Amino acid sequence: MAKDRENIPVAPTLMGSLRSMGYSFESAVADVIDNSISAHATFVKVLFPTTPLEPTAVGILDDGEGMSDEKLFEAMRYGSMASEAERDEDDLGRFGMGMKAASLSQCRNLTVVSYRQEKRSAYTWDYDYIQKKQKWIIQELTSQEIDN
């Protein structure tokens, strides 16, 4: 009888490959905005540097439904949604990869902060940290880190 063996992908190698999936800046931002629309946001604001002296960072803020800590943690998991799962016709999401792959195709650090029922949650995928640790480690931010 065949023996089962778990074969976990090498974290920095796979994340590096996913970062190279060919997103343009515009399509990456559109993918993240689609998540805002799926969360019934009526307001989406895109923040980006306007001068060379500003830090190179893009922020996408919305007034969508938000996610609980548990739901946000799951949303930050690569492959968090089955391709066969039912979803709205106009929802671009299919495999639970878009937000992470789109965002990290343009940067080395993805932080998502969510507010749900007066509670804040935040997680960060940091490509450099994953390379250092050689593991799929996501960082949970403290309230103080969220405020900064």
Where are these regions (language model features)?
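Bergerat-fold GHKL ATPase/HATPase_c domain
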Residues: M1-P49, E70-E74
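Residue-level signal for pocket-adjacent positions within structured domains
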Residues: P9, T13-G16, D62, D90, ...
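General structural signal for secondary-structure boundaries
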Residues: P9-M15, S68, D126-D128, T142-E145
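Amphipathic alpha-helical transducer elements in NTP-driven molecular machines
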Residues: G22, E26-A30, D69, L92, ...
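Conserved beta-strand-loop-beta-strand hairpin that lines the nucleotide-binding pocket
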Residues: S36-R87
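GHKL-type ATPase core
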Residues: A85-N148
